[in-house]
């Protein structure tokens, strides 16, 4: 029999994360968004709650929860503050999960306790100014030198890049080998030749740090290589698989927040001597949001369950990411419609929900990339390979 009930422990963790989100994140979200302020105090508080190392084994300083439980935490954080949810997605899903799976014991001992405790943040250096979805054609180069590697290149749209102590840098060792020449390096950001620059003027996630990274002759030892030369593409894809799950879970939070705000406003706002919640077309929008929220949550839970049981889940994770991100955009847009003119200003949070949701259809694989992954599973044809 299929079981749709959470365990007592999962319900408790979800409730605790929700209370934290309401108490700590919600009161600051608007001002941090207005001021483009990356709130490091909130980051530290999330670390103290165990959010940054939620899926990391306890022996390395993490909480050791399963993916379904992790998704519950991410949803509750995303319900109030997508900028802070981004911190969890990057540190936990992209960086920590990669080190757990691909790192040496030395990598794990050196970095995981720092990342879980918030002593250090990490960033994921894959995207470049001229390379987004086409990860096999990176321009950043890794040149073998005596005892190590020399890195040259640049990375773009890197979340947490200005605040990270550790950067996962993907570089090409041999352009003729395409994806088989990619390598992944763990690079301390205080390395000579490493620099970052803030990116401002974003539509959403204004409370999240975003950077452009430059690597000008950055030298790292052989021990900085994660996996083997040629493993970089596999490392990137496995990290993105984990990251897509957390983005989807966070978008369920946006859907729920949009629904909650809309129901509250529609029951309070009166026109023609009655609450607008009684109008059939408003109820239609609310009903659509209920369906989208529950459907997105169900897809995320299924992807999490597959991850926890060790079953193949790449397609299901892409399905969850595609549906939940598009649903978040639509639910937030409907929430603005329910709020009318009030939804167009930041006195209410729904306009921020829409701005924050929009980027989720772009990063960690665009909606179009997710559709290609999903279609590949039924056709057996990779649309990205000539």
Named regions from a protein language model:
Residues 118-126:
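A short, Trp-centered hydrophobic/proline-enriched beta-strand micro-motif
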Residues 65, 134-136, 160-165, 178-181, ...:
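Short glycine/proline-enriched turns and hinge-like loops at secondary-structure junctions
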Residues 115, 130-133, 157-160, 174-176, ...:
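Short Gly/Pro-enriched turn/cap motifs at secondary-structure boundaries
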Residues 96-102, 124, 176:
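Flexible, glycine-rich active-site loops centered on histidine and acidic residues
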Residues 50, 74-78, 171, 187-192, ...:
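Short Ser/Thr-interspersed hydrophobic loop/turn segments at strand-loop and sheet-helix junctions
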Residues 148, 152-196:
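A short core secondary-structure module
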Residues 1-90, 102-107, 114-119, 132-135, ...:
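Alpha-helical interface subdomain recognition
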Residues 137, 190-219:
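Flexible, small-/acidic-enriched active-site or ligand-binding loops
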């Amino acid at each position: 029999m299929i079981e749709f009930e959470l365990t007592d422990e999962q319900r408790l963790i979800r409730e605790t994360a929700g209370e934290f989100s309401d108490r700590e994140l919600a009161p600051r979200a608007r001002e941090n968004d207005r001021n483009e302020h990356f709130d490091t105090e909130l980051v530290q508080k999330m670390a103290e709650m165990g959010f940054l190392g939620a899926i990391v084994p306890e022996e390395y300083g993490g909480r050791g929860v399963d993916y379904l439980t992790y998704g519950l935490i991410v949803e509750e954080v995303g319900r109030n503050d997508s900028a802070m949810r981004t911190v969890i997605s990057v540190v936990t899903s992209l960086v920590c999960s990669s080190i757990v799976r691909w790192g040496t014991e030395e990598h794990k001992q050196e970095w995981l306790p720092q990342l879980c405790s918030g002593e250090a943040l990490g960033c994921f250096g894959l995207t470049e100014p001229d390379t987004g979805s086409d990860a096999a054609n990176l321009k950043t180069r890794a040149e073998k030198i005596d005892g190590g590697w020399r890195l040259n290149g640049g990375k773009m749209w890197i979340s947490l890049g200005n605040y990270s102590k550790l950067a996962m840098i993907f570089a090409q060792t041999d352009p003729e080998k395409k994806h088989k020449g990619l390598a992944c390096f763990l690079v301390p950001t205080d390395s000579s030749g490493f620099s970052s620059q803030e990116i401002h003027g974003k539509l959403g996630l204004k409370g999240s740090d975003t950077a452009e990274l430059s690597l000008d002759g950055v030298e790292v030892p052989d021990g900085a290589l994660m996996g083997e030369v040629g493993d970089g593409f596999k490392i990137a894809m496995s990290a993105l698989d984990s990251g897509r799950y957390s983005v989807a879970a966070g978008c369920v939070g946006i859907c729920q927040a949009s629904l909650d705000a809309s129901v509250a406003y529609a029951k309070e706002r009166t026109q023609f001597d009655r609450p607008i919640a009684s109008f059939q077309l408003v109820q239609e929008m609310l009903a659509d949001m209920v369906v989208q929220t529950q459907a997105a949550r169900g897809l995320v839970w299924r992807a999490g369950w597959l991850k926890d049981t060790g079953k193949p889940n790449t397609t299901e994770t892409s399905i969850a990411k595609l549906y939940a991100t598009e649903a978040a955009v639509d639910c937030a847009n409907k929430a603005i419609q329910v709020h009318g003119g009030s939804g167009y200003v930041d006195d209410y949070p729904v306009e921020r929900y829409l701005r924050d949701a929009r980027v989720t259809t772009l990063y960690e694989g665009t909606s179009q990339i997710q559709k290609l992954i999903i279609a590949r599973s039924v056709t057996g044809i990779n649309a990205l390979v000539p």
